[in-house]
């Protein structure tokens, strides 16, 4: 018996049969070993053939195991097994059957026909319901009238089952999400599919607009019979490129698989529509030196109209891959899929709502759906509807589900805090100094309070979780009943349809209403409804933009914004008021949604608080004064440096890195942008800023649009500072007019015209400097406290520092130098020499022209 005459699959099965015999301590490889190996073979055709011929596979497996257990076992044979006489006879019979069929290689399905001639196996197969006529029909169907002329012939069989996913079968079983709207695009696709030749639509659109959903909608329409006669009873198969490429080790294997798929499709004679998602992957797939890629293999079938194909790809990839291949492009008809409007998105979300409710076991309210569509459209600019809105709904529902399944956040926070306190308690118990004992007493008091609070909350949580009954189980049953009703309607099974429509479904709906009314009681810890607030929270977490409803505390904070900013910025009432009003307009939802929150030009002499106000604003909004995009415009003095802001153009070094300004805003869409010393930049930089100030958008070097609508743009400049110094006694409007005449000479009118407000900063007086000295000395007190020293400054000392630090030309900056020289330097010397001891009050006074420290 020449083993080379067997197909690859048959050879693998023989090896498995040998392993099975060795494992069972059998001396001979019997036919029962080989049939068991064939039945368990991955990707083999034996199991599908037996199923098609009406065999009972579980019974067959049991019978084969029983036969295996009857075989004699020989221990100590050293694993040497031989082929039994009966198996040799069956393999010879297989060879004879192959010659009758004019096959060059012996395939595994012929062994089934030969097995019927064997006494033992023949009895087992007949007992399991296998008849010779049925088996022969099943084999012929699998072979498809082809001879076995290749050792890999078995692997290319049933290519459609192996390498495609049946979307119509999934639609029949209700596994596809409902497709709402998109009638125009589906109608256009159907129109192209009905052509005589070149009947291949390709859906082109941005990622996330619903191209794949359109094909799923087409499959659902075919199943429901809502298509023209030419498309009725057709199957929509989705080509699985991963399965097609996976495991294709040798050259030509991928092409062989694809050719097998195309051959089977041509045999279907137009009854199958092949859907290729990401069709651009076909161009270049399997391409090696001298080999054809998949795109070229498709061309003849597409041109002749043998292959009904629907493709889907994005605009960029269509241009990059398919438009370059003009011969492939002309075989497809383009169907553009645009982004749906907010209203269409709301309709789509309402259709999907039930599926997401069943999956997450939560309830999604209508305001949440409206909020997901409107908020994602406004605040997520780099993605498309409906995908970004669906993501918001999905994530919000997931977070609610996570809360129900796991400990609620208040409980979790308390538990972590208790663990933290216990660890601290253990560490402090080992210390014996006064400070540690004091801290331990405070800590134990806090620990007791937290543990009591935790116990109370845990009881509430358990009670609420028990109250949430099984509405989701009823919802899943209801969804299943509706799917069954659709299947009954398609099969014209009116008895089952009426039973479901008038019996089962109304009963389930009644149960659901009762369960939901029981759940409707107010809950304190657990939430099971997704509302617009949850959607806003998810969006805020993802983008950093505060769109969630303002808490009372935040409202009060915004109303007292000037007061908060004045704690760090002394004087400059006009500037603080202008910035505060812009932030309040934005948070109240009154600002223009197509412009930045506010754009300001701060003018004034050096050291009066222009940059400090930006830092204070960033600290107010984000609790971190470094949370702002600070760009020193003095770095952009040359014309070519403009590209650093938006990124280098294609072909230049650094193209992939993106721009300094655009990348920072893409990562943090809600931020304060400080353009410091703006007058020092090249004039071309201002041309870039025109779009930012007017439309709140900027296109970077890679062609991506960056959204600036949630930023506060602040530019600082020293222009006209000499006029401010010289005319400090003038009233604010007159001074502003004077300074604006200088600004108008430096900046272009179109730039000045786009700025929301130009604010002139006043020079600082002596009383302002004294207040700033108080703020800066308070920071020094805080720094010293961390080292164990308690400082106190007398009024005389404050007056002296204010006097020394005052300079009408340089503003508040000399004050820092005065504090260093007059206070910090002597303090450092006294601490290092041991004259000042920790944990005691140090009074710093100004006596007889000297700053002295007393303890």
Swiss-Prot record:
Q: List every stretch annotated NBD1.
A: 158-339
Fetch the CDD domains from UniProt.
AAA (cd00009), RecA-like_ClpB_Hsp104-like (cd19499)
Read off the InterPro entries from this record.
AAA+_ATPase (IPR003593), ATPase_AAA_core (IPR003959), Chaperonin_ClpB (IPR017730), Clp_ATPase_C (IPR019489), Clp_N_dom_sf (IPR036628), Clp_R_dom (IPR004176), ClpA/B (IPR001270), ClpA/B_CS1 (IPR018368)
Subunit and interaction comment: Homohexamer. The oligomerization is ATP-dependent.
Q: Which Gene Ontology CC terms are recorded?
A: cytoplasm
Annotated stretches, region: Linker: 340-544
Record region (NBD2): 554-763
Q: Where is this region: Repeat 1?
A: 6-71
Its protein name is Chaperone protein ClpB
Q: Which PANTHER family match?
A: ATP-DEPENDENT CLP PROTEASE, HEAT SHOCK PROTEIN 104
Q: Name one GO molecular function term.
A: ATP binding
Protein function: Part of a stress-induced multi-chaperone system, it is involved in the recovery of the cell from heat-induced damage, in cooperation with DnaK, DnaJ and GrpE. Acts before DnaK, in the processing of protein aggregates. Protein binding stimulates the ATPase activity; ATP hydrolysis unfolds the denatured protein aggregates, which probably helps expose new hydrophobic binding sites on the surface of ClpB-bound aggregates, contributing to the solubilization and refolding of denatured protein aggregates by DnaK.
Keywords of the record? ATP-binding, Chaperone, Coiled coil, Cytoplasm, Nucleotide-binding, Repeat, Stress response
Its GO biological process terms? cellular response to heat; protein refolding
Query: Which intervals of the chain are annotated as region Repeat 2?
Result: 83-145
**Record's SUPFAM superfamilies?**
Double Clp-N motif, P-loop containing nucleoside triphosphate hydrolases
